[in-house]
C-alpha cells in the first residue's frame, strides 16, 4: 500500500524496487513513477480499508484480516490474540523522508481505547539510510510545561527545545507514546508499530500557514498526551557505524526497567545465526537476524508469532 506524502521521495520505487499501482474512480490502473512523492509503503497492514494481500502460497489472494478472521490465535498465538483480538497487532512500513516530517505525537493504548476505540501507537524506527545533515527530533532537551510547548508551536520556535539526533545507518529509535518527534532531511526508515494510525500533528514547519500545503493541526486535542520530561536516552540505540560509541543494549524506556541492570542482550546464536535484540517493550520485542544460511524456525515452541 503506497501513501503519498508532501515530505516523501522516490527511493521506495527507484532504490527498493517497489511497484505501486493506483486506480482512479473508473478503475483505470496507473503505475506510480519516480515523479510522485511516496512517503510510506505499508508492507504488512491490517487496517480495515488498507489491508495487505497475501501474494503466494495456498492462502494467496486473501487479506491479512481475512486470515485473522479464520485462523484467530493460530496466527498470532493465544496470549497475543487474547489482548489484541482479531486485528493483526503490528503495522510495518518503509518510510522515505526527503523533507520535514511534522512534529507529532501518538497516544498510548489506554487513551486511544477510551477516546477513539483504537490501539495506541508505540513504534520503532530502524535507519536503513541517512544522508549527511539528516536529523531526527525526539523528546526535549529539558523539561518544559504544556503552556511553553503550546506557545512555541504557535510562534514557530518549538525546534529550539527538541532533542536532536544525527542518525546513521543501522541506528534504532524507540518512540514511546507521548514522545514528541519529527524528522528533517533525507532518511529512509523501517517503521514497526502497533496497528494504529492515530497521529496528532502538533506543528508542520509553516506548511499549515499556506492554504496550498495546510494539513490539520491537533495541538489542543493532544496537549495532555505529551511527555514533557527530558529525552530518555535508553530509547536510542547507536548502530555499528558509531564505532566505539555503538550501543549493544536494546532500546527500551525507564518504565520498562530494562536499562537499570545488566541483561544478556549480546549477540547470541539461534541455530548458528547471529541475533541481536534491538527493542524490548510491553508492545513488542524486535530482533535483528544476521543470516548467512537458510534459517528454519519452529513456531510451535513460541507463545506468540515471529
Predicted feature locations:
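Active-site glycine-rich loop that binds ribose-phosphate moieties when present
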Residues: 144-174
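Transition-metal
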Residues: 1-144, 204-251, 267, 286
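A short hydrophobic beta-strand segment most commonly corresponding to one strand
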Residues: 123-125, 182-206
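Conserved metal-binding segment of the jelly-roll/cupin
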Residues: 103-106, 166-185, 192-194
Amino acid at each position: 500500500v503506497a501513501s503519498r506524502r508532501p515530505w516523501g521521495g522516490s527511493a521506495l520505487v527507484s532504490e527498493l524496487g517497489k511497484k505501486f499501482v493506483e486506480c482512479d474512480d473508473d478503475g483505470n490502473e496507473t503505475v506510480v513513477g519516480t515523479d510522485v512523492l511516496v512517503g510510506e509503503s505499508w508492507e504488512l497492514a491490517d487496517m480495515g480499508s488498507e489491508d495487505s494481500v497475501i501474494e503466494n502460497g495456498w492462502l494467496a489472494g486473501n487479506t491479512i484480516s481475512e486470515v485473522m478472521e479464520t485462523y484467530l490465535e493460530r496466527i498470532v498465538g493465544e496470549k497475543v490474540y487474547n489482548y489484541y483480538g482479531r486485528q493483526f497487532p503490528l503495522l510495518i512500513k518503509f518510510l522515505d523522508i526527503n523533507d520535514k516530517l511534522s512534529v507529532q505525537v501518538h497516544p498510548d493504548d489506554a487513551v486511544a481505547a477510551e477516546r477513539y476505540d483504537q490501539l495506541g501507537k508505540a513504534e520503532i524506527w530502524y535507519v536503513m539510510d541517512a544522508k549527511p545533515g539528516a536529523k531526527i527530533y525526539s523528546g526535549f532537551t529539558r523539561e518544559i510545561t504544556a503552556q511553553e510547548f503550546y506557545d512555541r508551536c504557535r510562534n514557530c520556535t518549538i525546534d529550539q527545545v527538541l532533542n536532536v539526533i544525527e542518525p546513521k545507518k543501522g541506528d534504532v529509535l524507540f518512540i514511546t507514546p507521548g514522545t514528541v518527534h519529527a524528522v528533517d532531511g533525507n532518511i529512509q526508515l523501517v517503521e514497526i508499530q502497533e496497528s494504529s494510525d492515530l497521529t496528532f500533528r502538533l506543528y508542520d514547519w509553516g506548511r499549515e500557514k499556506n492554504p496550498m500545503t495546510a494539513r490539520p493541526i491537533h495541538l489542543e486535542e493532544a496537549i495532555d498526551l505529551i511527555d514533557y520530561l527530558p529525552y530518555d536516552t535508553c530509547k536510542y540505540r547507536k548502530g555499528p557505524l558509531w564505532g566505539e560509541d555503538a550501543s549493544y543494549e536494546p532500546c527500551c524506556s525507564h518504565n520498562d526497567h530494562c536499562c537499570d541492570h545488566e541483561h544478556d542482550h549480546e549477540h547470541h546464536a539461534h541455530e548458528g545465526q547471529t541475533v541481536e535484540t534491538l527493542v524490548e517493550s510491553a508492545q513488542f520485542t524486535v530482533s535483528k537476524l544476521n543470516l548467512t544460511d537458510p534459517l528454519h524456525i519452529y513456531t510451535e515452541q513460541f507463545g506468540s508469532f515471529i
